[in-house]
From Swiss-Prot:
Upper taxonomic lineage: Viruses, Riboviria, Orthornavirae, Negarnaviricota, Polyploviricotina
This protein's name: Non-structural protein 1
Protein's organism: Influenza B virus (strain B/PA/1979)
Residue segments, region RNA-binding and homodimerization: 1-93
Name of the gene encoding the protein in the UniProt record: NS
GO biological process, alphabetically ordered: symbiont-mediated suppression of host ISG15-protein conjugation; symbiont-mediated suppression of host PKR/eIFalpha signaling; symbiont-mediated suppression of host type I interferon-mediated signaling pathway
Example GO molecular function: protein serine/threonine kinase inhibitor activity
Pfam family of the protein (one): Flu_B_NS1
Main location: host cell
Subcellular location: Host cytoplasm; Host nucleus
UniProt motif (Nuclear localization signal) ranges: 50-55
Superkingdom field: Viruses
Region G1P2-binding, annotated ranges: 1-103
């Protein structure tokens, strides 16, 4: 891990996803208009094509998770994205764009709009990422799994056994990967297990997931804030399974925290939350 690696902070939220997709669609519209004017060079044309392909794929994936009444085409999102640019550039409060609602704090000495202090509406009012505790909340008897020099089959089996023996209620799972002298990540998962009368246990809620490097530095953080907690049982299992698969690949090269976070976030369709710069760490 690089010494100057910074913490990758991630928040999963459908509102932010819509805003991002719509804004990028607005950027695509600007690229296309510039191209029509024959004012776009070859690298710019290449970026236009790549952005269009990326957006078409993201919209297709995102629409699957939306009710039919809220699904939008690329063209519809372009129109919203252009309006969002007007909001950003001209601070026009009358735009009324879903998923992007800027607000202003009134200056009591003067109620004219130009004297408002503008800011982006926080995804969770009153709570920002940096205000959330870094460690998953304390629980009794946390489970720790140390995978040392195990082949993939044995490692997966050990994880499966440990997870399935969790008692009902909150849990914290620590996974340490150490194989073939590969740099390992320490992963803390915080969630809730439910126990059924027939003895079957299942992960019902995933609250938080932190990834640390060998020096104990927090390098990736997936946060589900109160209104964004993953409540779906299948989502919880997919996220954990994706994480376990990533940790158990046993590649000879160092495991990268950003890649691990991408693997987890992809289960939400939220891998874009990592910037290219963070992904290169």
């Amino acid at each position: 891990m690089a010494e100057n690696m910074t913490t990758t902070q991630i928040e999963v939220g459908p509102g932010a996803t819509n805003a991002t997709i719509n804004f990028e669609a607005g950027i695509l519209e600007c690229y296309e208009r510039l191209s029509w004017q024959r004012a776009l060079d070859y690298p710019g044309q290449d970026r236009l094509n790549r952005l269009k392909r990326k957006l078409e794929s993201r919209i297709k994936t995102h629409n699957k998770s939306e009710p039919e009444s809220k699904r939008m085409s690329l063209e519809e999102r372009k129109a919203i994205g252009v309006k969002m640019m007007k909001v950003l550039l001209f601070m026009n409060p009358s735009a009324g764009i879903e998923g992007f609602e800027p607000y202003c704090m009134k200056n009591f000495s003067n109620s004219n709009c130009p004297n408002y202090n503008w800011t982006d509406y926080p995804p969770t009012p009153g709570k920002c990422l940096d205000d959330i505790e870094e460690e998953p909340e304390n629980v009794d008897d946390p489970t720790e799994i140390v995978l040392r020099d195990m082949n993939n089959k044995d490692a997966r089996q050990k994880i499966k056994e440990e997870v399935n023996t969790q008692k009902e209620g909150k849990f914290r799972l620590t996974i340490k990967r150490d194989i073939r002298n590969v740099l390992s990540l320490r992963v803390l998962v915080n969630g809730i297990f439910l126990k059924y009368p027939n003895g079957y246990k299942t992960l019902s809620t995933l609250h938080r997931l932190n990834v640390y490097d060998q020096s104990g530095r927090l390098v990736a953080k997936l946060v589900a804030t109160d209104d964004l907690t993953v409540e779906d049982e299948e989502d919880g299992h997919r996220i954990l399974n994706s994480l376990f698969e990533r940790l158990n690949e046993g590649h000879s090269k160092p495991i990268r925290a950003a890649e691990t976070a991408v693997g987890v976030l992809s289960q939400f369709g939220q891998e874009h939350r990592l910037s290219p710069e963070e992904g290169d760490n």
